[in-house]
Amino acid sequence: MSTNSGTEYLCRENHPWAAGVAAGCVACLLALSGCATHGTSRTGRGLPKSAYPVTPQTNVVETLHGVRVADPYRWLEDENAPATKAWVEAENKVTFAYLAGIPEREAIQRRLTQLWNYERYGVPVKQGGRYFFSKNDGLQNQSVLYVAESLDAAPRVLLDPNTLSKDGTVALSGTAISDDGQRLAYGVAVAGSDWQEWRVRDVATAQDLPDVIKWVKFSGASWTKDGQGFFYSRYDEPTEAQRLTKVNYFQKLYFHKLGTAQAEDVLVYERPDQKEWGFSGGVTDDGRYLVITVSQGTDPKNRVFYKDLQAPGAKVVELLNDFDASYNFIDNDGPVFWFQTDLDAPRGRVIAIDTRAPARRNWKELIPQAAETIQGVSAVNQQFFVNYLKDAHTQVKVFDLGGRFVREIPLPSLGSAGGFSGKRSDTETFYSFTSFNTPGVIFRYDATAATSTVFRQPKVAFNPDDYETRQVFYASKDGTRIPMFISHKKGLKLDGRTPTLLYGYGGFNISLTPSFSVANLVWMEMGGVYAMPNLRGGGEYGEEWHQAGTKARKQNVFDDFVAAAEWLIANGYTTRARLAISGGSNGGLLVGACMTQRPDLFGACLPAVGVMDMLRFHKFTIGWAWTSDYGSPDNAEDFKALLAYSPLQNLRPGTRYPATLITTADHDDRVVPAHSFKFAARLQACQRGANPVLIRIETRAGHGAGKPTTKLIEEAADKLGFLVKTLRMSVKPPE
């Protein structure tokens, strides 16, 4: 189906600690030695309370469901207020002075830069006989979009986002290529904002057309078969003062005809009676239908409507009109639609629905639920390519259109594979493979010969064979079996005091799978252990696993993470003082909750762009959409559960909390920075002892998507330097 992306307002991060930076690099000298000795840092690591800016407290108290709740730092929610801007400047001054004073930081940043400097390719997409792909030469702030007339032809630059801003903070946020390969619709985002502006470029000339589409958020674009226009979703224009904080309701689906002004765009579908509904429109490959996926917040359950584009005056048909399961459209054979669904199958199955006889009794199951969890399905070469997760690593199986198993596609090792896009008539497809020690390799799959060949493989400045990964299973507090990946250098002596970084997420049906990260590699080079458990709330084992970590069951996620930490200590990897935890967005909430519940268990904490005020998250931008996972503070029962773990409300004065580096960004309009601002102010006030409490506030940056390479490297260097100092590691300087 010709579409870019759907409603992507998941509470999710993209930053140096999130495994998933496809990598490789040119040859360079080893800058840091794997030498995690247990000596004392060359400088003191503590900060007295007098080092922090004075943060005024105001007398703001609300009574919520009979409970009086104080919110003395609410004034920090106004990011445009002069007082807030002054506070940000003062906090950053303290933070960056502390980080700059870490002797090892310069060498760490140098090594990060060396390892980041390699060619990285995206998975190619074929449209109209042309091949489109992204490529980053190494240290470019943004990847460049290329086009080639054939696989053997020299590619040419189609769109270079690096030319759109001097500091690299204007990023490509989405692309959609017309069926004939003649036009490119593309979205750009400024300073990491979720707001996008869409434009159109002629592929032959690489020149923009006059078309400009504004106020797009959580939407891709999907071209009509004739390439004369595309469908997209948008919100009403906010005022400038409310652009980063206004709640986003009433998304609408439009059609834009090339060569016309946005004011002339045709409203295709809206629901004034359903303010929380979001719409993603995709045109089927045969061009006949517009398939409308209807979502409500981040709940994976959705409805599906469609419109016959070949029938003049056709109305929107409500095909699946209940939020009873997830239905992901795969492709169609005329009036027969194929879906991946978890209806009566929490790990997923594939069904066929004939739109001429859509009653549920007429549905046909093509691929039944398996022991593994379906992550995605595509239709290429008259076959289904099904991406499964088996204990959080990828398996890819091929079935014919009748659902009969054909073969499994061999993968290099335990890791993650993604891609396999294309049309049903295509005889080739492309996919990427990555693992903790393998930067992204692009493969071309010949569907006729059933063979994979390496299409692009990065040249790396380290030996992947120097590292090893194992998967263990441990028992959580309630006995649930939880998987965890553990990676480190081969031959690493585990003496029970090895610096260890524990990373987690656990929410929104999102699966964490093995993936390469430059920051994680440098951590392991320095002798650290990297551990990543697959917590409940994620999607690794299907919808039941997801639901086990939501709403009143959210505490399960924190228990799973704490149990992972205790397992690492009990099994001789590390000590409490040398164990750090990290997570972003929903993972930032995870870190905040665990450090408030078990401040004794960790040596350092790195919460990034976290949801810290669980009593007010629903009042900003798209926060209301997360109630499917968190519950609503407006509901008395949900409020009780939220108050029990909300990081901001559970900080206690006079408690010795771990050394903490909070990270956020001034343009984050998904998890607004007020969450981190208020948490930092409260934590600094509550902290007993000299463990530092710092907040690093990135300027001209958002939730993480599109962050330029320079900022990614600087942030990773700051975090690694902070861990080296607070965990008392000794790192050998570069030779």
Feature locations, PLM:
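Cap/lid segment of the alpha/beta-hydrolase catalytic domain
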Residues: 162-178, 186-193, 204-210, 404, ...
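Bacterial signal peptide processing site
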Residues: 36-38
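Non-catalytic accessory segments flanking enzyme active sites
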Residues: 82-176, 187, 277-308, 313-332, ...
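Beta-propeller blade signature
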Residues: 147-148, 199-203, 247-259, 304-309, ...
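Short coil/turn segments that connect the beta-strands within blades of beta-propeller domains
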Residues: 129, 180-182, 226-228, 288, ...
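A flexible loop/linker signature enriched in serine peptidases of the S9 family
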Residues: 136-143, 165-170, 188-197, 212-217, ...
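C-terminal motif of bacterial Sec signal peptides marking the signal peptidase cleavage site
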Residues: 32-34
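Active-site-proximal cap/loop segments of hydrolase catalytic domains
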Residues: 519, 526, 532-735
